Amino acid sequence: MHCLLCDEYISYAISWYTFFVKLHKKYICDRCEQKLSYILGDICKECGRPLELVPAEYKNGDICMDCIRWTNEQGFPSLINRSLHVYDEGMKEILAQFKFRGDAELVHIFHQPFRSLFQKYFANVSVAIPVPLSEEREYERGFNQAELLASCLPIKMFCTSLRRIETEKQSKKKRKERISGVNPFYFQGEEMFHEQHVLIVDDVYTTGITVRQIGSLLYDRGAREVSCLTLCRG
């Protein structure tokens, strides 16, 4: 087996234990695995941001000021997000390979830890909804990375009639532009989510606007609660 990131051969240490016990298949070598920055320690109880990365003046107890502003200034209900990795330079490079270079096989690297994170925080959700790409973006890429991540979870993935209008890439916009922009998401169909706890799945949580734009539509259609599971927290 070769590492999906660097293509180096992955060797296994042979012992009596490995002779009798089936090893889990590895998709990444030890050297590349060290590049993955897992979120550990204290986090914002809402958005999951590592609190050690937040200056003291930008947090109030165990909540960051971004989440407080979303509730107090923007009027959005509190929303729980949990992420697996810090969106640092190493993860940016890996996600670029995953998303923009069309390497969908990289989802295998994240399958088990992403699934474990789900089971830790969201075992009681009703359904998972991946964030859609616009038709143009999905055609360019050949797949939707959020759908691949959602397929890792032991829960029904609901591919709804939720659609996304083609807009400028979020990564090219400043925070203020993202928050003040028009909601690009809409439902084509008549799906309802009466009293359901809906989990939105995406690759990166940065400002939180995407999940709240979709969340507002879900609440309008009867959802009891909306949460979010993402691969990385920016």
Give the label of every model feature segment.
Residues 1-234:
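Glycine-rich phosphate/pyrophosphate-handling loop used in enzymes and phosphotransfer proteins
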